Amino acid sequence: MRKYLLATAALCALAASANAESVRMSVGSYNLNNLPFPVAASLGFYKDEGLDVTTENFAQGGSKVLQALVAGSTDVAVGFYDHTIQMQSQNKHVVGFVQLARNSGLVLAGTNDTDFDPAKPETIKGKKVGITSPGSSSDFFIRYYMKQHNLSDNDISIIGVGSGAAAVAALQQGKIDLLVNYDPAATIVVERGLGKILIDARSDQGAKDVYGGIYPTSVLYATQDYINANPEVIQKVTNATVRALHWMKQHSAEEIVAKLPDDFVSGDKQTYIKAVEAAKAIFSEDGKFEPADLETPLAVLKSFNDAVAKATIDLNTTYTNKFVKAAASKGGN
């Protein structure tokens, strides 16, 4: 009887696998802004929704994921909201449908002996500044900083160094003087005594100091065409991801890290736990977009991106709360 039950269970599992809907999801890097995505995957929430998720980590920043989405080589992107604005200025319709992080989580770090002083912005001149990749939100950060202080992009060298361990190594090895990046890189730099945080946009106040307001960052987004053609898949992805946001809210940083694959954890585990603890405040609790907050990234992009500045951007078409609201009505954690 037991063998029969086991065999039946195995057949049911095979049938469920065969009926699973395939969806390709890509992420620019496993910085902590994107953490709800691997948490949902590790806890099996996408499988629970009947999805067979294929994941690609470009490990080079959000601009690469955006390119893949527009080219049709991925279905859903895990990246920053500001890319939806950028695409609308190019007459391409990309829509955010779950907000993961409600603040940037970005910092500007320097070596311990750096002579750059944020109180004297001109001291950044001549510096090599590491970002995740050209066209990424870390790139937007430094360009906005330069613009706000009446400095030119030509006053510095902007260099793509990736994120996580690669970014930390670039600073440690002297390939760059300053680093614009996320946790865990930010916490690793400090914990290892490799440098110090000079500008910190991880908190609400920090975001207001840097950007002038709350700056929504990591979201799940897809092309409008894909959303229109696959609303059930988008809903299932949303259900699983919102469930992960709820789960993260209810668990400690240590419990969250314990659920992640070892190869996801950058640096030593204790430092990574500290990084997750530092980042927990940036995550959305319910996945909803707050329309007023979306004005901040629009203002930032307009300040240095000519295409965005010249375009008439309709923020209402850059996001939707439809699927998050449906997930909330479904309930469950």
Model feature map: region roles:
Residues 21-152, 157-161, 173, 177-183, ...:
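Short, glycine-/small- and polar/acidic-enriched structural segments
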